[in-house]
A protein has these predicted regions:
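An anion-binding loop in the catalytic cleft
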Residues: 214-306
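Donor/substrate-binding cores of folate-linked one-carbon enzymes
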Residues: 21-22, 32, 81-200, 205-207
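N-terminal glycine-/serine-/threonine-rich beta1-alpha1-beta2 phosphate-ribose binding loop
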Residues: 36-78
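Conserved beta-strand segments of alpha/beta enzyme cores
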Residues: 25, 56-58, 102
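A short, local hydrophobic-aromatic micro-motif
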Residues: 27, 104, 145-148, 245, ...
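Short beta->alpha connector loops
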Residues: 8-11, 63-66, 87-89, 227, ...
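N-terminal Rossmann-like dinucleotide-binding module
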Residues: 1-42
Length: 306
């Protein structure tokens, strides 16, 4: 079976690497254009492009599929199946109609829950106990295609979105290869989604970053976990604005108002939240500084405990 792979981040790279190592015929790889990063604004290739070039696969980086020339270029590759994993571009019906067996996608949620662009992050932000990867057929609707298989995993109590994404990539890679095999063998099921049960996972924004200390401890912990690595939770502590990377539950009670600094311990900064509870800020970053353990920062920048 002749494949064309479409993907961009590390999550997609894991799937491409598995397909290539398992010996599938990959005619070409499509990925988003190189993006400028850091102060020098140097163009950085996607993880998928880096891997594809390292093993000699042809790489295409179209701006979109709106023009006929780009669609015709794909048509000339004569793919039997498109494998799409976190590509980051909308594929029109004219593209989905090209392969004999259509297009499949590895989506980072237990569909029909959390359709959309940020399913892994929203699974933590929504306080879910379980996450997963769904192998599905692509359709014109957003993540509405028929399901082929779902593989699930428990979300760990203090796991960040970044850490969960890495674990889900290890679920997605073998699922991707197994799905291609089942389609090739003619044994892949088509299970329609129950649209009545659908929930959505919209793109994250920086406006979501500020921590609301009036929330319960679990909401604050999940808020911080869900926003790593981007856009990262923010808070003002002792008059300084910080990015907050890791927060844990604390047993200590307090009469201080939510958002007040309660104490600095060897493990981190205790901050008051709802109903007299506290959370422990373990890792943070001041503006212009480095990400570091909270005790290390406050050793050099003493904080006043009122």
């Amino acid at each position: 079976m002749r494949l064309v792979f479409m993907g961009t981040p590390e999550f997609a790279r894991a799937c491409l690497e598995k397909l290539h190592s398992d010996g599938f015929d990959i005619a070409a790889v499509y990925t988003k254009i190189d993006t400028p990063k850091n102060r020098g604004m140097k163009l950085i290739p996607s993880p998928v492009k880096e891997y594809a070039q390292s093993v000699g696969l042809s790489v295409y980086q179209p701006q979109s599929f709106r023009d006929e020339e780009t669609v015709q270029q794909l048509r000339e590759l004569k793919p039997d199946l498109l494998v799409v994993v976190a590509y980051g571009k909308i594929l029109p019906q004219a593209v989905l109609d090209i392969p004999k067996y259509g297009a499949i996608n590895m989506h980072g949620s237990i569909l029909p829950q959390l359709r959309g662009s940020a399913p892994v992050q929203r699974s933590i932000l929504n306080h879910c106990d379980e996450a997963g990867v769904t192998a599905m057929y692509l359709s014109a609707g957003m993540d509405e295609g028929d399901i082929i298989e779902i593989r699930k995993t428990a979300i760990q109590p203090l796991e960040t979105s970044e850490e969960l994404m890495a674990r889900l990539a290890q679920l997605a890679a073998p699922l991707c290869a197994d799905t291609v095999r089942s389609i090739e063998a003619g044994t892949a099921p088509r299970i329609p989604q129950d649209n009545a049960r659908a929930t959505y996972a919209p793109m994250l924004s920086k406006e979501e970053s500020p921590i609301d200390w009036n929330q319960p401890a679990r909401f604050i912990v999940d808020h911080v976990r869900g926003l790593v690595p981007w856009p990262v939770a923010t808070a003002e502590l002792g008059g300084t604005e910080f990015k907050i990377y890791r927060v844990e539950y604390a047993d200590q009670k307090t009469e201080k108002a939510p958002g007040s600094v309660v104490a600095l311990t060897k493990k981190g900064l205790l901050v008051a939240c709802q109903e007299g509870n506290t959370v422990l800020v373990r890792e943070l970053q001041a503006k212009g500084g480095k990400r570091m353990p909270a005790p290390d920062y406050f050793r050099g920048h003493p904080i006043t405990i009122e």
